[in-house]
Amino acid sequence: MSATEAPPAPAGPQEPVLRKPSTRKRLVPYWLLLPGILWLLVFFALPLVYQASTSVQTGSLEQGFEVTWHFQTYVDALREYYPQFIRSLLYAGTATILCLLLGYPLAYLIAFKAGRWRNLVLVLVIAPFFTSFLIRTLAWKTILADGGAVVDVLNTLHVLDVTSWLGWTESGRVLATPMAVVCGLTYNFLPFMILPLYTSLERIDGRLHEAAGDLYATPATTFRKVTFPLSMPGVVSGTLLTFIPASGDYVNAELLGSTDTKMVGSVIQSQFLRVLDYPTAAALSFILMAIVLLAVTVYIRRSGTEDLV
Protein backbone atom coordinates (compact mmCIF):
# COMPACT_ATOMS: atom_id res chain seq x y z
CA MET A 1 0.00 0.00 0.00
CA SER A 2 1.45 3.39 -0.98
CA ALA A 3 1.62 6.35 1.41
CA THR A 4 -0.92 8.33 -0.61
CA GLU A 5 -3.55 5.55 -0.78
CA ALA A 6 -6.61 6.28 1.38
CA PRO A 7 -7.54 3.72 4.00
CA PRO A 8 -10.66 1.69 3.29
CA ALA A 9 -13.89 3.23 4.58
CA PRO A 10 -15.37 1.53 7.62
CA ALA A 11 -18.25 -0.76 6.88
CA GLY A 12 -21.66 0.78 7.63
CA PRO A 13 -24.37 -0.93 9.66
CA GLN A 14 -25.72 -3.91 7.85
CA GLU A 15 -29.46 -4.17 7.35
CA PRO A 16 -31.04 -7.11 9.17
CA VAL A 17 -31.93 -9.99 6.96
CA LEU A 18 -35.69 -10.63 7.07
CA ARG A 19 -36.30 -14.31 7.01
CA LYS A 20 -39.42 -15.46 5.29
CA PRO A 21 -41.63 -17.42 7.70
CA SER A 22 -41.89 -21.08 6.98
CA THR A 23 -44.91 -22.49 5.25
CA ARG A 24 -46.02 -24.21 8.44
CA LYS A 25 -46.07 -20.94 10.40
CA ARG A 26 -47.94 -19.13 7.64
CA LEU A 27 -50.64 -21.81 7.68
CA VAL A 28 -51.18 -21.72 11.45
CA PRO A 29 -53.92 -19.01 11.35
CA TYR A 30 -55.81 -20.95 8.69
CA TRP A 31 -55.60 -24.17 10.71
CA LEU A 32 -57.02 -22.30 13.71
CA LEU A 33 -59.92 -21.06 11.57
CA LEU A 34 -60.65 -24.50 10.17
CA PRO A 35 -62.82 -25.83 13.07
CA GLY A 36 -65.04 -22.75 12.99
CA ILE A 37 -65.35 -22.88 9.21
CA LEU A 38 -66.27 -26.56 9.30
CA TRP A 39 -68.84 -25.90 12.04
CA LEU A 40 -70.50 -23.14 9.99
CA LEU A 41 -70.38 -25.27 6.86
CA VAL A 42 -71.95 -28.36 8.45
CA PHE A 43 -74.48 -26.72 10.77
CA PHE A 44 -75.36 -23.53 8.87
CA ALA A 45 -74.50 -23.51 5.17
CA LEU A 46 -75.47 -27.09 4.30
CA PRO A 47 -78.83 -27.00 6.16
CA LEU A 48 -79.56 -23.66 4.49
CA VAL A 49 -78.87 -25.10 1.05
CA TYR A 50 -80.95 -28.18 1.86
CA GLN A 51 -83.91 -26.09 2.99
CA ALA A 52 -83.57 -23.90 -0.09
CA SER A 53 -83.84 -26.97 -2.30
CA THR A 54 -86.78 -28.21 -0.22
CA SER A 55 -88.66 -24.96 -0.77
CA VAL A 56 -88.70 -25.48 -4.55
CA GLN A 57 -89.96 -29.06 -4.39
CA THR A 58 -93.39 -30.33 -5.32
CA GLY A 59 -95.20 -33.51 -4.41
CA SER A 60 -96.48 -35.07 -1.22
CA LEU A 61 -95.17 -37.21 1.61
CA GLU A 62 -96.87 -40.31 0.19
CA GLN A 63 -95.73 -39.82 -3.41
CA GLY A 64 -92.41 -38.24 -2.54
CA PHE A 65 -91.01 -34.77 -3.14
CA GLU A 66 -89.07 -33.74 -6.22
CA VAL A 67 -87.08 -30.60 -6.97
CA THR A 68 -88.93 -28.86 -9.80
CA TRP A 69 -87.78 -25.26 -9.22
CA HIS A 70 -91.43 -24.38 -8.81
CA PHE A 71 -91.57 -21.02 -6.97
CA GLN A 72 -95.35 -20.99 -6.75
CA THR A 73 -94.93 -22.36 -3.23
CA TYR A 74 -93.57 -18.98 -2.12
CA VAL A 75 -96.50 -17.12 -3.66
CA ASP A 76 -99.07 -19.47 -2.12
CA ALA A 77 -97.38 -19.37 1.30
CA LEU A 78 -97.23 -15.58 1.36
CA ARG A 79 -100.82 -15.22 0.14
CA GLU A 80 -102.21 -17.67 2.70
CA TYR A 81 -100.16 -16.73 5.75
CA TYR A 82 -99.53 -13.00 5.36
CA PRO A 83 -101.62 -12.22 8.51
CA GLN A 84 -99.21 -14.34 10.55
CA PHE A 85 -96.24 -12.46 9.08
CA ILE A 86 -97.78 -9.09 9.96
CA ARG A 87 -98.65 -10.35 13.43
CA SER A 88 -95.12 -11.65 14.01
CA LEU A 89 -93.52 -8.34 13.04
CA LEU A 90 -96.03 -6.40 15.14
CA TYR A 91 -95.54 -8.53 18.26
CA ALA A 92 -91.75 -8.66 17.86
CA GLY A 93 -91.52 -4.91 17.25
CA THR A 94 -93.72 -4.12 20.25
CA ALA A 95 -91.73 -6.46 22.49
CA THR A 96 -88.46 -4.91 21.28
CA ILE A 97 -89.67 -1.38 22.09
CA LEU A 98 -90.83 -2.51 25.54
CA CYS A 99 -87.49 -4.24 26.17
CA LEU A 100 -85.68 -1.01 25.26
CA LEU A 101 -87.91 1.12 27.49
CA LEU A 102 -87.53 -1.28 30.41
CA GLY A 103 -83.94 -2.32 29.81
CA TYR A 104 -82.28 1.06 29.28
CA PRO A 105 -83.05 2.48 32.74
CA LEU A 106 -81.95 -0.76 34.38
CA ALA A 107 -78.73 -0.89 32.34
CA TYR A 108 -78.08 2.77 33.23
CA LEU A 109 -78.65 1.98 36.90
CA ILE A 110 -76.23 -0.95 36.80
CA ALA A 111 -73.54 0.99 34.94
CA PHE A 112 -73.58 4.25 36.93
CA LYS A 113 -75.57 3.85 40.16
CA ALA A 114 -75.31 0.25 41.37
CA GLY A 115 -71.86 0.62 42.93
CA ARG A 116 -70.90 -2.44 44.96
CA TRP A 117 -74.24 -4.05 44.10
CA ARG A 118 -73.40 -4.14 40.39
CA ASN A 119 -72.34 -7.78 40.24
CA LEU A 120 -75.38 -8.90 42.20
CA VAL A 121 -77.77 -7.06 39.89
CA LEU A 122 -76.02 -8.52 36.83
CA VAL A 123 -76.44 -12.01 38.28
CA LEU A 124 -80.14 -11.33 38.79
CA VAL A 125 -80.41 -10.19 35.15
CA ILE A 126 -78.92 -13.40 33.78
CA ALA A 127 -80.56 -15.66 36.39
CA PRO A 128 -83.51 -16.52 34.10
CA PHE A 129 -81.07 -18.17 31.70
CA PHE A 130 -80.53 -20.89 34.31
CA THR A 131 -84.15 -21.94 33.79
CA SER A 132 -85.63 -23.53 30.71
CA PHE A 133 -87.20 -21.16 28.20
CA LEU A 134 -90.27 -23.38 28.17
CA ILE A 135 -90.65 -23.36 31.97
CA ARG A 136 -90.29 -19.57 32.12
CA THR A 137 -93.04 -19.20 29.53
CA LEU A 138 -95.32 -21.67 31.29
CA ALA A 139 -94.93 -19.65 34.49
CA TRP A 140 -96.58 -16.72 32.75
CA LYS A 141 -99.72 -18.81 32.24
CA THR A 142 -100.11 -18.81 36.02
CA ILE A 143 -99.22 -15.13 36.37
CA LEU A 144 -101.75 -14.05 33.73
CA ALA A 145 -104.44 -16.59 34.61
CA ASP A 146 -108.04 -15.42 34.85
CA GLY A 147 -108.88 -14.32 38.38
CA GLY A 148 -105.22 -13.97 39.34
CA ALA A 149 -103.69 -11.08 41.24
CA VAL A 150 -102.22 -9.44 38.12
CA VAL A 151 -105.51 -9.50 36.23
CA ASP A 152 -107.39 -8.20 39.28
CA VAL A 153 -105.01 -5.26 39.64
CA LEU A 154 -105.24 -4.43 35.93
CA ASN A 155 -109.03 -4.57 36.12
CA THR A 156 -109.09 -2.34 39.19
CA LEU A 157 -106.89 0.23 37.46
CA HIS A 158 -109.05 -0.04 34.31
CA VAL A 159 -105.95 -0.88 32.27
CA LEU A 160 -107.74 -3.78 30.61
CA ASP A 161 -110.49 -1.43 29.47
CA VAL A 162 -107.93 0.51 27.45
CA THR A 163 -106.16 -2.57 26.09
CA SER A 164 -109.50 -4.14 25.18
CA TRP A 165 -110.40 -1.00 23.25
CA LEU A 166 -107.06 -1.32 21.43
CA GLY A 167 -107.77 -4.98 20.68
CA TRP A 168 -104.86 -6.33 22.72
CA THR A 169 -106.97 -8.06 25.38
CA GLU A 170 -110.44 -9.42 25.76
CA SER A 171 -112.97 -8.22 28.30
CA GLY A 172 -111.54 -8.85 31.76
CA ARG A 173 -108.85 -11.33 30.71
CA VAL A 174 -105.26 -11.31 29.47
CA LEU A 175 -104.39 -14.93 28.75
CA ALA A 176 -104.83 -16.08 25.13
CA THR A 177 -104.61 -12.49 23.88
CA PRO A 178 -101.95 -10.47 22.01
CA MET A 179 -100.98 -8.76 25.28
CA ALA A 180 -100.08 -12.12 26.84
CA VAL A 181 -97.86 -13.03 23.89
CA VAL A 182 -96.09 -9.67 23.98
CA CYS A 183 -95.61 -9.95 27.75
CA GLY A 184 -93.99 -13.36 27.30
CA LEU A 185 -91.73 -12.11 24.51
CA THR A 186 -90.71 -9.05 26.52
CA TYR A 187 -89.88 -11.06 29.62
CA ASN A 188 -87.94 -13.79 27.80
CA PHE A 189 -85.84 -11.45 25.65
CA LEU A 190 -85.31 -8.57 28.10
CA PRO A 191 -81.84 -9.82 29.20
CA PHE A 192 -80.72 -9.77 25.56
CA MET A 193 -81.43 -6.03 25.60
CA ILE A 194 -79.99 -5.21 29.02
CA LEU A 195 -76.56 -6.81 28.62
CA PRO A 196 -75.48 -5.01 25.40
CA LEU A 197 -76.82 -1.74 26.79
CA TYR A 198 -74.87 -2.20 30.01
CA THR A 199 -71.69 -2.98 28.08
CA SER A 200 -71.97 0.23 26.03
CA LEU A 201 -72.88 2.41 29.00
CA GLU A 202 -70.12 0.98 31.18
CA ARG A 203 -67.51 1.97 28.58
CA ILE A 204 -68.49 5.66 28.63
CA ASP A 205 -65.78 7.76 30.27
CA GLY A 206 -67.16 9.42 33.38
CA ARG A 207 -65.09 12.52 32.66
CA LEU A 208 -67.41 13.28 29.75
CA HIS A 209 -70.30 13.65 32.17
CA GLU A 210 -68.15 15.88 34.38
CA ALA A 211 -67.23 18.01 31.37
CA ALA A 212 -70.89 18.36 30.44
CA GLY A 213 -71.65 19.48 33.99
CA ASP A 214 -68.82 22.02 33.86
CA LEU A 215 -70.49 23.46 30.76
CA TYR A 216 -73.72 23.88 32.77
CA ALA A 217 -75.55 21.08 30.98
CA THR A 218 -78.55 19.73 32.85
CA PRO A 219 -78.77 15.97 33.52
CA ALA A 220 -81.38 15.68 30.78
CA THR A 221 -79.15 17.51 28.30
CA THR A 222 -76.16 15.39 29.31
CA PHE A 223 -78.15 12.24 28.68
CA ARG A 224 -79.47 13.50 25.33
CA LYS A 225 -76.18 14.90 24.04
CA VAL A 226 -73.61 12.56 25.61
CA THR A 227 -74.91 9.36 27.15
CA PHE A 228 -77.49 8.21 24.63
CA PRO A 229 -75.40 8.86 21.47
CA LEU A 230 -72.43 7.02 22.97
CA SER A 231 -74.65 4.08 23.92
CA MET A 232 -76.03 3.63 20.39
CA PRO A 233 -73.90 0.49 19.74
CA GLY A 234 -75.65 -1.16 22.67
CA VAL A 235 -79.05 0.05 21.52
CA VAL A 236 -78.51 -1.37 18.04
CA SER A 237 -77.07 -4.66 19.30
CA GLY A 238 -79.83 -5.10 21.88
CA THR A 239 -82.52 -4.32 19.33
CA LEU A 240 -81.18 -6.87 16.88
CA LEU A 241 -80.70 -9.53 19.56
CA THR A 242 -84.30 -9.00 20.66
CA PHE A 243 -86.20 -8.44 17.42
CA ILE A 244 -84.66 -11.22 15.32
CA PRO A 245 -85.40 -14.18 17.64
CA ALA A 246 -88.73 -12.69 18.75
CA SER A 247 -90.00 -12.48 15.17
CA GLY A 248 -89.49 -16.22 14.68
CA ASP A 249 -90.59 -17.34 18.14
CA TYR A 250 -93.48 -19.76 18.44
CA VAL A 251 -93.33 -20.93 22.08
CA ASN A 252 -94.93 -17.79 23.52
CA ALA A 253 -97.64 -17.72 20.86
CA GLU A 254 -98.45 -21.39 21.43
CA LEU A 255 -98.52 -21.31 25.24
CA LEU A 256 -99.81 -17.81 25.98
CA GLY A 257 -101.87 -17.08 22.88
CA SER A 258 -104.70 -18.60 20.88
CA THR A 259 -105.50 -19.33 17.26
CA ASP A 260 -106.11 -15.60 16.76
CA THR A 261 -102.59 -14.73 17.96
CA LYS A 262 -100.66 -17.36 16.02
CA MET A 263 -97.30 -16.16 14.70
CA VAL A 264 -95.51 -17.38 11.61
CA GLY A 265 -93.12 -19.43 13.75
CA SER A 266 -96.08 -21.50 14.90
CA VAL A 267 -97.13 -22.05 11.29
CA ILE A 268 -93.63 -23.18 10.31
CA GLN A 269 -93.48 -25.56 13.28
CA SER A 270 -96.89 -26.97 12.40
CA GLN A 271 -96.04 -27.40 8.72
CA PHE A 272 -92.81 -29.21 9.56
CA LEU A 273 -93.99 -31.48 12.38
CA ARG A 274 -97.75 -31.94 11.98
CA VAL A 275 -98.85 -31.27 8.41
CA LEU A 276 -95.51 -32.57 7.05
CA ASP A 277 -95.65 -30.08 4.18
CA TYR A 278 -91.91 -29.51 4.00
CA PRO A 279 -91.83 -27.26 0.89
CA THR A 280 -94.32 -24.81 2.39
CA ALA A 281 -92.51 -24.80 5.73
CA ALA A 282 -89.17 -24.14 4.03
CA ALA A 283 -90.67 -21.38 1.88
CA LEU A 284 -92.18 -19.71 4.95
CA SER A 285 -88.78 -19.85 6.66
CA PHE A 286 -87.02 -18.11 3.78
CA ILE A 287 -89.76 -15.50 3.43
CA LEU A 288 -89.45 -14.70 7.14
CA MET A 289 -85.67 -14.53 6.83
CA ALA A 290 -85.91 -12.12 3.90
CA ILE A 291 -88.43 -9.88 5.70
CA VAL A 292 -86.34 -9.75 8.87
CA LEU A 293 -83.14 -9.00 6.92
CA LEU A 294 -84.91 -6.21 5.05
CA ALA A 295 -86.30 -4.74 8.28
CA VAL A 296 -82.91 -4.92 9.99
CA THR A 297 -81.16 -3.30 7.01
CA VAL A 298 -83.65 -0.43 6.90
CA TYR A 299 -83.36 0.04 10.67
CA ILE A 300 -79.56 0.17 10.60
CA ARG A 301 -79.49 2.61 7.69
CA ARG A 302 -82.16 4.89 9.13
CA SER A 303 -80.44 4.98 12.52
CA GLY A 304 -77.09 5.82 10.89
CA THR A 305 -75.25 3.00 12.61
CA GLU A 306 -73.82 1.12 9.63
CA ASP A 307 -70.31 1.38 11.09
CA LEU A 308 -71.38 0.16 14.54
CA VAL A 309 -72.55 -3.32 13.55
Regions found by a protein language model. Give the residues of each.
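Interhelical loop and adjacent transmembrane-helix boundary motif
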Residues: 23-28, 55, 60, 73-80, ...
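Membrane-interfacial helix termini and adjacent extracytoplasmic/periplasmic loops
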Residues: 66, 137-185, 220, 256-260
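Transmembrane alpha-helices
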Residues: 35-38, 43-44, 127, 187, ...
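C-terminal transmembrane helix and the adjacent membrane-cytosol boundary/short C-terminal tail
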Residues: 2-6, 10-13, 198-209, 213, ...
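N-terminal signal-anchor/first transmembrane alpha helix
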Residues: 2-5, 12-50, 119, 123, ...
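Short membrane-interfacial helix/loop motifs at transmembrane-helix boundaries
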Residues: 44-81, 89, 147-148, 153, ...
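Transmembrane alpha-helix signature in integral membrane proteins
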Residues: 79-112
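Cytoplasmic-entry segments and transmembrane alpha-helices of multi-pass inner-membrane transporters
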Residues: 33, 106-143, 209-210, 223-224, ...
